[in-house]
């Protein structure tokens, strides 16, 4: 069967948009990453008054952050598409720099609350790691810390050693980034 990571209902297209809610419904979506944007757009498209709360000042979540890695810049296309889709919806209200606290959520009298708050990288159980990671006094980075300092890394790291813990997709992206800079990677 045909499948798509971006559009799980690829075979059905926009069929869901033909079904509208038949009563007033307020939806609060917490988190403005790709999952939160998709949830908010979908709720608004079926007629719900939708309020998206994003604690940061940018939408797109991890996809937008990871797109800062040069080899991953096309990842920004999907959040940009979702943001454009959201802009077209008159019943979707986006609040940046607004945390999904109980007090903030109650203001919108929600019938439905969607939590799309993302996740944090899982750290290996290495003594002292939590105190040192993403700390200015150390050169140990999580993927989020690495991306936030991506422009600080020299273009040429020849002779410098880099250790990457984790061989999943994110780890391989990091390896590729430092390999392009001639680092000695373990």
What are these regions (language model features)?
Residues 1-23:
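Cysteine-cluster motifs in flexible loop/terminal segments that predominantly coordinate metals
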Residues 13-15, 59-63, 123-124:
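Short acidic/His/Gly/Ser-rich catalytic and metal-binding motifs that mark active-site loops
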Residues 17-19, 24, 65-77, 147-154:
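Short, contiguous acidic/charged loop-to-helix segments that flank catalytic cores in large enzymes
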Residues 21-52, 95-109, 117-126, 143-186:
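Rossmann-like dinucleotide/flavin-binding elements
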Residues 56:
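Residues in the short beta-alpha loop(s) of Rossmann-like NAD(P)-binding domains
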Residues 63-110:
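N-terminal Rossmann-like dinucleotide/flavin-binding domain of flavoprotein oxidoreductases
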Residues 86-94, 133-139, 183:
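A short helix-to-beta-strand connector/capping loop
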């Amino acid at each position: 069967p045909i499948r798509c990571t971006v559009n799980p209902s690829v075979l059905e297209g926009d069929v869901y948009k033909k079904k509208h809610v038949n009563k007033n419904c307020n939806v609060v979506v917490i988190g403005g990453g790709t999952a939160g944007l998709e949830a908010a757009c979908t709720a608004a498209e079926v007629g719900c008054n939708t309020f998206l709360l994003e604690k940061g000042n940018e939408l797109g979540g991890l996809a937008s952050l990871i797109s800062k890695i040069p080899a991953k810049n096309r990842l920004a296309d999907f959040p940009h598409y979702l943001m454009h889709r959201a802009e077209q919806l008159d019943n979707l209200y986006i609040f940046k720099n607004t945390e999904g606290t109980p007090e903030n959520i109650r203001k919108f009298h929600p019938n439905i609350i969607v939590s799309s708050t993302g996740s944090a990288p899982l750290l290996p159980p290495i003594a002292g790691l939590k105190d040192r990671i993403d700390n200015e006094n150390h050169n140990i980075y999580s993927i989020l810390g690495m991306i936030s300092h991506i422009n600080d890394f020299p273009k040429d790291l020849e002779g410098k050693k880099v250790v990457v813990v984790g061989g999943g997709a994110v780890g391989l992206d990091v390896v590729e980034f430092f390999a392009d800079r001639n680092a000695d990677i373990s």
